[in-house]
Amino acid sequence: MRSHYCGDVNKSHVGQEVTLVGWVNRSRDLGGVVFLDMRDREGIVQVVYDPDLPEVFEVASSLRSEFCVQIKGLVRARPDSQVNADMRTGEIEILGLELTVLNSSAPLPINMDKNQHNTEEQRLKYRYLDLRRPEMADRIVFRSKVTSAVRRFLDGNGFLDIETPILTKATPEGARDYLVPSRTYKGQFFALPQSPQLFKQLLMMSGFDRYYQIVKCFRDEDLRADRQPEFTQIDIETSFMTSEQVMAKTEEMTRGLFKELLDVDLGEFPRMTFAEAMRRYGSDKPDLRNPLELIDIADLVKEVEFAVFNGPANDPEGRVAVLSIPGGAKLSRKQLDEYAKYVTIYGAKGLAWMKVNDLDKGMEGIQSPVLKFLTEDVVKALLERTGAQTGDVILFGADKANVVAEAMGALRLKAGEDFDLLKGDWKPLWVVDFPMFERTSDGGLHAMHHPFTAPSNMTPAELEANPTAAISDAYDMVLNGCELGGGSVRIHNSEMQSAVFRILGINDEEANEKFGFLLEALRYGTPPHAGLAFGLDRIIMLMTGASSIRDVMAFPKTTTAACPLTNAPGFANPVQLVELGVSVIEPEVKDGE
C-alpha cells in the first residue's frame, strides 16, 4: 500500500511518483489550494492538492484531523523561500495526484497538537491516539533502536538470549509480589518475577556462561515518576568473569549505545566508592553535572556553645556538613525558609544558614542567625574550608549522618537546579564498594543489594562475626544522578549463602523452604558468576529527555497502577474465583460512606 514512509521522502526523490499511507496531521485551505500535512511513524510530509483535479480536490477539502488516508503524488522541491528547516522533509512537498480515504475519524477526545495540554488520564485512556503524536512515536521508535543495538552487541559478544519463567515462586526481594492463584493447587500461588535473578544464576550453574534477556519484571510497590508496576530490564549474567570484566563489558555496551544513537562520546567512566559518594554528594547515585559538594565541618564546631551543632559533632553517629552555594547570598529570608522546609521532607529538623555579604569586612560582612554562637576563628576556618566568596551562602546540616546525607544531598540537587549550576550534558560513573548490609528501622539487617550478592574477600565465618563491616562485590552504573543499572558478583557456594540468610534472620528451615532449590544447586560445582541488570525504561527516558518513564512505554500504568485504557484492574468473574478457590474480602464501608 506504500512505496515510502512519510518521513523518509527527501530531495533525492524529486521527480519520482510515491505512494504514502498515514494520518492527516493538519489540513489547510489557502487560496483554493489544500495543504495536507500527512503523518506516519517516521515523520510528516506536506502534500499539495490544487483544483486541476476536481474530484481529488473535493476529497482533500473534506479531510479532517486523524483521517487515515492513502495518497499518490509527485515529489517536487520547494522554492527556497518555502523550505521548512524544522521538518525532516522540509525541502520537498508532494503534488497530490490521487487520494483514498481508508477510514474517517470521529471528533477527537484529546488534543493532538503538542502545544495543547492533555491530562495524564486523558493521554492514557486514549493512548492509541497519544502514541500517534510525533514526540511519542519518536520515543517508541528510539526504544526499538536501543533494544536492537543491545541485542547486536550482546549477540556479537557470545551472549545467549534465554527466556526465564514468568510464573514462579515468591521470594523476598524487597518489594511486594504480584500473586497468581493456581487452579490446580488450591490455596497456592505463583508470583510474577521481580527479576529473573535466581533463574539466571541457575543458568550459570547449567553451563550457559553468557546469558542475556530483555525481560518484563513486576513489583507491587508505591509508584513515582520513574517507577511502574511492570517494567523492562536488560538482564545480563556471566560465568568466569570478574566484577571488573563485567563492568568493562557493560560500559563498552553503554558507550556504544550513546555513540550510535546520539553521537555522544561518554568517555571512560570514573569510579567512586559508596562511602565517597555519600560523603561528598549525600547520594549513592550522584549527579556529577552539579559542582556542589557536602563539606564536613564537625571538627570546627565541636566546642561551640550551640547544641544543634556540637551535639552531632560529638556524636559518633552524627555529622555536621555544609553546602556553599555561589551567588546564594541573594536568597531572601522567605526562600531560605522554603529550603528549611524542604529538608524536613528528608528527616532534617531545620536548616541554618550564613550569608557572605562582604568577605573583606570580616565578621561585619557575615549575616547569620547562628553567628552569635560562632567565634571569629570558627567563622574564618569555615570560610577557608568552603572557599566561600562575597555573595555566597553557606547552608548547614547537623543531625545523624544518614539524615544529613539524605537531606543535604537532596538540597544539593535542588540548589543546583535553582542556581543553574549543572555543567555538561552527560556525566557517567561507577559506584562501587557498597556495604553488604544496612540497618533496618527495628535494628535488624537487610541486604543493600539482594541476598545473593557476594562479599569482597571474606569467609562465611568472618562475615557472620562482623556483618556490618562487610563490603559487597557490587557495582552500580550511574548517569546524571540516575542509576542505569546495578549488579554484583554472586555467592557461588552454599556455606556462604546460608551464612547470609542467617545474618538476615532467615533460619535454616525457612531458607530451605524458600530457597532449598538454590542451596541444593550450589552444591554441584557452581561456577563463579556475576551479572548486572539495566532498567531499559530509565535508559530510554534519559536518552530521549522524557520527564517520566510513562512517556517511553507504549502502554504504561498510572501512578496508582491502573490502566485507564482497559479499565484494569477489574473484578474477576465469580465462577473463576470458585474454580481458583479464592474468596474476596470486601473492604469495610465506614459510616457515612
UniProtKB/Swiss-Prot annotation:
What is the annotated localization of this protein? Cytoplasm
Coiled coil: which residue ranges? none
Keywords, alphabetical: Aminoacyl-tRNA synthetase, ATP-binding, Cytoplasm, Ligase, Nucleotide-binding, Protein biosynthesis
Catalyzed chemical reaction(s):
tRNA(Asp) + L-aspartate + ATP = L-aspartyl-tRNA(Asp) + AMP + diphosphate
Region annotation (Aspartate) maps to: 197-200
Its BP terms in the Gene Ontology are: aspartyl-tRNA aminoacylation
Question: Molecular function (GO) terms listed?
Answer: aspartate-tRNA ligase activity; ATP binding; nucleic acid binding
Q: What is its EC number?
A: 6.1.1.12
Query: Which sites bind L-aspartate?
Result: 173, 219, 449, 490
One Gene Ontology cellular component: cytoplasm
- Pfam families per UniProt: GAD, tRNA-synt_2, tRNA_anti-codon
What SUPFAM superfamilies does the record point to?
Class II aaRS and biotin synthetases, GAD domain-like, Nucleic acid-binding proteins
Residues the entry annotates as binding ATP: 219-221, 228, 483, 535-538
What the protein does comes down to: Catalyzes the attachment of L-aspartate to tRNA(Asp) in a two-step reaction: L-aspartate is first activated by ATP to form Asp-AMP and then transferred to the acceptor end of tRNA(Asp).
Assembly:
Homodimer.
The record's annotation in HAMAP family points to:
Asp_tRNA_synth_type1 (MF_00044)
Family assignment from sequence similarity: Belongs to the class-II aminoacyl-tRNA synthetase family. Type 1 subfamily.
Q: Which PANTHER family does this one have?
A: ASPARTATE--TRNA LIGASE, MITOCHONDRIAL, ASPARTYL/LYSYL-TRNA SYNTHETASE
Protein name, as recorded: Aspartate--tRNA ligase
Question: To which species is this protein native?
Answer: Shewanella piezotolerans (strain WP3 / JCM 13877)
